[in-house]
Structure formats: C-alpha cells, structure tokens
UniProtKB/Swiss-Prot annotation:
It comes from Prochlorococcus marinus (strain SARG / CCMP1375 / SS120). Residues 608-619 have a biased composition (Low complexity). Residues 620-633 have a biased composition (Acidic residues). Keywords: ATP-binding, Chaperone, Nucleotide-binding, Phosphoprotein, Stress response. Acts as a chaperone. The modification Phosphothreonine is found at T197. GO terms for molecular function: ATP binding; ATP-dependent protein folding chaperone; unfolded protein binding. Residues 600-633 are annotated as: Disordered. PROSITE patterns: HSP70_1 (PS00297), HSP70_2 (PS00329), HSP70_3 (PS01036). NCBIfam families: PRK00290.1, PRK05183.1, prok_dnaK. This is Chaperone protein dnaK2.
Length: 633
C-alpha cells in the first residue's frame, strides 16, 4: 500500500499532510506555503491556475475565478440562494443542480469539479515531496455536512484521481491531532470555525480511543460571512458618500472582498486597520477611491450577530453530550476564524474556560486526517475512532410526518431496520421518501431522494411487511435496502433525486480531468522548454562575449550558429526544434568549455616549465654565503 495523505479541503484554504516516521508532517505546496488557497481560475489564454497564483489574479479576472466552491458542493440551487449572491462568478441552475459558469471557456463546471482541481494540486505537490504518485487519501468535511455533501466530496476526490479511503469529520480530525500522544482521559470540546462552515464536537479522548459524544454546527457560517459584513459596510459607506453601489461592479466587489479579508486578519492583532483602495471606480468628475479606517470595536459591532450565532451550537453539543461546561477539560480552537478576539471571548464566556491554543488552527485538521490515513495504511497502531452521524435520518410517513430511523449523534458505522406496510388494498409497490434533519414535518427537512420497491403481492392494506434498512458506513454515507418479507424478495435500493452527481457524470468528469491533466502537463512542458531555451540563448551570448579570443574562431562559430538557430525556434514557438537544439547547444558549450580548460592547462604547464628552468639555473649558482643564526633576546 502506498502513502495515504490527509487532506483538509477547506472553503478558503486547504492543507495536506502525511505520516512520516510515525509522525504527521504538513507538506508545503510547490510555492513553498503550508496552506493552499482553495481557488481555481482560467485565464484569457484558457490556462488553468490553482492556489495562490489563481487568488492573485482574481481582481482582474473575477468572472473566471472560482473560490468558496465548498459552499456549493452537494447542494441544490434552492439551497444556495444567499451564497450565490456573494461570489463574483455566476452560479447557474442545471435541473436542480448547481453549476458555476466559466465565460472564458464557454463552459459550466460543477462545484465538485472545482474542488477536484484543488485536490489534484494538493496530491500532486505531495507526490513531488514524497517522490511517488499519490492516489489514496483521507478527506475531511464539516461535521454537519449532510449525506449529499459527503457523497459529493467523495465524488470530487474521484474526479481528482484519488481513491477516498475515508471521509472524516473536521473536528474529529482535529481531536485526533490534539490527542494522539495523550494518555490521560480528557473530555474536549472542538470549536471549529472555518472559512465557510462552523462545527462543534464534544469528544472523550484518552489512551488511543477517540469517541465523539455529540456534534452540532452551522454550514452557513464561517469566515466568508465575517468578510461580507465588512464588504457591506465599505459599500454602504461609499454609496452614502458617492451615490455609487460598488457591489454591482464585479471587479470592485472582488477588491472589496480582498480588502475585507485583509482587514479582518489585521484586526485580530491590531485595534484598527486602514483600508485604502485607490481608483475603485470612476465618474465623469474623475476617479473615486475608498479610504476608511475600521476599528476592531466597529468590526465586532458589525459582526455581533454572527458571533452570537456561534453560541447555540456550543450549547446544543453540550446538551446532546449530557455534559455541563464544568465537565469539559479542554477547548480546542480550529480554523483561521478562531483567531478573532471576539470569538475567543465568546468561547470563554460560554464555557468558562480559556481556549487551548497549542494546536495550529490552519493545519491541525490535515494533521488529523493524515493520522487517520496512517491508521488505514497500518502505519499507526492502537487508535480507535468512534464518530457519529450529525443529523437524524428517517422516512416520510402518512400525513407528511418525518419518522426517524437513526437519530443524530448515533455512533457510525450503524445499521437500523424498520418494518413498514401498504396504505391501500391491493398495493403492489411502495415509494419511500428518505429524509435527513431534525424537524417534525418532512417538508422542513433535507430530501435525500426517493426509492421504490415493486412486485409486492396484492394484499389488503397493512398486511404486507416491508423491511427497510438504513446503513451508514464509516464515511457517514447512507445506503438503503428493502425486503418484502412475504415474497422473500430483496432489493438493494439506490437513492435517486439527491443533489449529488450521477455515476455517469462522475465518470465523464474523471475522464475530462485526466484529459485536461495531460493537456496541462503538455502546456507546462512547452513553457518549461521555452524558458530553458531562452535562458540558454542568453547565457550562450554572455559566455561567448566573456571568452573573447580565448577560444579559436571555428569553435565559436559553431556555437554561435546553434545559438541563432535556437533563438529563431523560440521566436516561432517551434517546441520540437527547441528540444533538439537545446541538447545540441548544450553539447557544443560543453565542448567549448573543455577546449578552454585544455588551453588554460597547456598555458599553465608551459609556464611551469619556464619556472622550473629558472630554478635549475639558481641551483647551479656557487656564490653561496654561509652564516650562523643567533636568537636575539
């Protein structure tokens, strides 16, 4: 079994880690950073950019730069109305699925495809670091992700060419990293406020056992929302002063968003931040600028509602775990947004404890995923992880009521069977609506789809006995089977109508990704060979000038001819010729260098010979004076 990497696929930033020598190691990306922005962009030349390089050009290319795609993964259009208004690219409807429009390619992407490009970069960078291809991974998701979002994350991994061995909850991964070497039993509360989601989990940790007692959260709350309140404040202030709504200009909106994120980060350490955006827009009177000072107090006032929303999941998780705040030993803070002083203060106020800040909030989730990868690969022993399902699962029954089969915070994997019957005489099929959520009425919960069992022998209502089994695997993903006890007929049911991609769509995306990966590599190879050729042309010209008359003209002429040919090939973008000429010119330069050394050695030997003769003539001199040496004291 090859190396299994752990990947924290974040809303704003992602991170990859691996077990090395029994210890988890965070892997820096190709640019040298330990976290990678979860951003994918396509340039006007149709080149794909991923990570920091994609984020840098977002202001100039807002409609073709995709970020916060995690907020759309595994969700239907009617579930992302608010989120779709907060991004600079177009979010479109395709049936009930979400699609992200890329004008420069005249194409639509699923959010899973965008997430896959981030996963591909992380796995490729990890592969370069480890010196082997990476094709297996453990990927983390927010604890409060529903079945569709978990399946969609797995699909993203498949599109990226990865076998996803396990989907693990982010707070659980953080607890693994925190508690790996701890022997004493502790009850910990993981407070995970990331870029787009918020989770709280309560766990019992000790001696290699990690048992999740409860989990709660809000998949609509994260750092992006804190950025938004600053953006709204900047836009409202500018509109009041200038009468222009900057939110209608996608390029201006992108600049505001970047400035808001920067100010938010600065305000974690400073009491105020200067926001200066020159030439944000223009009117007939001339250019307009944003110039504003944002204090920490003002920011906390703007974000007070968001901070208050963090309170409820903490209280709910403690209630579900049947624990008081006094029974919690440690509060582990996870996610970049937990650096905000107001968030730390809220946690201290609610729990009565100072948060434990010994873990790196940006990396701890990936580290935990790597540990789980080590467990699955057999590298890490004596670790037992007992996770839970975050939301209840059930079916719609008579009157539009949700009847729960598996309640939230049930340890997974788990299996539950219930017996149902028909509602009318002579009924030969049953349609069952599968739901996920905590509300009493079916219409208020998340619909995972419907399934239908045919071939039931006609009988009076209430007589047929149909066993329905819900099975949740270790990834928290649901499968359903049904059996008619009367006929003995058993059928495996695949849920349809959910917001995840079909198998055919996933396979097509896998092939597209592989094709694009090949095309991208070819494009990169062409760029590399051209850069190499241009560098060689310059170095050759410089070297010939420095050598001057130290080499014979015939050797210089051969090198110069190759240099001119290579320069012409680079100007014509003739890559095959470039490859050949680069090798030829390098050989000529090696020969030229060798001849220079030979001439230099010959000259040195000649000089040594002259010196030797001079020494011999000195030895033959008889006019030698003898003298005594006396030390002077």
């Amino acid at each position: 079994m090859g190396k299994v990497v752990g990947i924290d696929l974040g809303t704003t930033n992602s991170c990859v880690a691996v077990m090395e020598g029994g210890k988890p190691t965070v892997i820096a990306n190709a640019e040298g950073f330990r976290t990678t922005p979860s951003v994918v962009a396509y340039t006007k030349n149709q080149d794909q950019l991923v990570g920091q390089i994609a984020k840098r050009q977002a202001v100039m290319n807002p409609e073709n730069t995709f970020y916060s795609a995690k907020r759309f993964v595994g969700r239907r259009v009617d579930e992302v109305n608010e989120e779709s208004k907060e991004v600079s690219y177009s979010v479109e409807k395709s049936g009930s699925s979400v699609k992200l429009k890329c004008p420069v390619l005249d194409k639509q992407f699923s959010p899973e495809e965008v997430a896959a490009q981030v996963l591909r970069k992380l796995s490729e960078d990890a592969g370069k670091y480890l010196g082997e291809n990476i094709n297996q991974a453990v990927i983390t998701v927010p604890a409060y992700f529903n079945d569709s979002q978990r399946q969609a994350t797995k699909d993203a991994g498949k599109i990226a060419g990865l076998e996803v061995l396990r989907i693990i909850n982010e707070p659980t991964a953080a607890a693994l990293a925190y508690g790996l070497d701890r022997k004493s039993n502790e009850r910990i509360l993981v407070f995970d406020l990331g870029g787009g989601t918020f989770d709280v989990s309560v766990l019992e940790v000790g001696d290699g056992v990690f048992e999740v007692l409860s989990t709660s959260g809000d998949t609509h709350l994260g750092g992006d929302d804190f950025d938004k309140v600053i953006v709204d404040h900047l836009a409202a202030t500018f509109k009041a002063n200038e009468g222009i709504d900057l939110r209608q200009d996608k390029q201006a909106l992108q600049r505001l968003t970047e400035a808001a994120e920067k100010a938010k980060i600065e305000l974690s350490n400073a009491t105020q931040s200067e926001i200066n955006l020159p030439f944000i827009t223009a009117t007939p009177e001339g250019p307009k600028h944003v110039d504003l000072t944002l204090t920490r107090a003002k920011f906390e006032e703007l974000a007070s509602n968001l901070i208050d929303r963090c309170r409820v999941p903490v209280e709910q998780a403690l209630k579900d775990a049947k624990l008081s705040t006094g029974e919690i030993d440690e509060i582990v803070m996870v996610g970049g947004s937990t650096r905000m002083p107001a968030v730390k203060e809220l946690v201290k106020r609610v729990t009565g404890k100072d948060p434990n800040q010994t873990v790196n909030p940006d990396e701890v989730v990936a580290v935990g995923a790597a540990i789980q990868g080590g467990v699955l690969a057999g590298e890490v022993k004596d670790i037992l992880l007992l996770d839970v399902t975050p939301l209840s699962l059930g079916v719609e029954t008579l009157g539009g009521v949700m009847t729960k089969m598996i309640t939230r915070n049930t340890t997974v994997p788990t299996k539950k069977t219930e017996t149902y019957s028909t509602a009318v005489d002579g009924q030969t099929n049953v349609e069952i609506h599968v739901l996920q959520g905590e509300r009493e009425m079916a219409s208020d919960n998340k619909s995972l789809g419907t399934f239908r069992l045919d071939g039931i022998p006609p009988s009076p209502r209430g007589v047929p006995q149909i066993e329905v089994t819900f099975d949740i695997d270790a990834n928290g993903i649901l499968s359903v089977t049904a059996k008619d006890k009367g006929s003995g007929k058993e059928q495996s049911i695949s849920i349809t109508g959910a917001s995840t991609l079909s198998d055919n769509e996933v396979e097509k995306m896998v092939k597209d990704a592989e094709t694009n990966a090949t095309a991208d590599k070819e494009k990169r190879d062409r760029i590399d060979i051209k850069n190499q050729a241009e560098t060689l042309v310059y170095q050759t010209e410089k070297q010939l000038g420095e050598l001057g008359d130290k080499v014979d003209e015939e050797a210089k002429a051969k090198v110069e001819a190759k240099r001119i040919q290579l320069k012409e090939a680079t100007e014509k973008d003739d890559y095959e010729t470039m490859k050949t000429l680069v090798e030829d010119l390098q050989k000529e330069l090696y020969s030229l260098g060798a001849s220079v050394y030979q001439q230099s050695n010959a000259a040195s030997q000649a000089a040594d010979g002259t010196s030797s003769e001079s020494n011999n003539s000195t030895e033959g001199n008889d006019d030698v004076i003898d003298a005594e040496f006396t030390e002077s004291k």
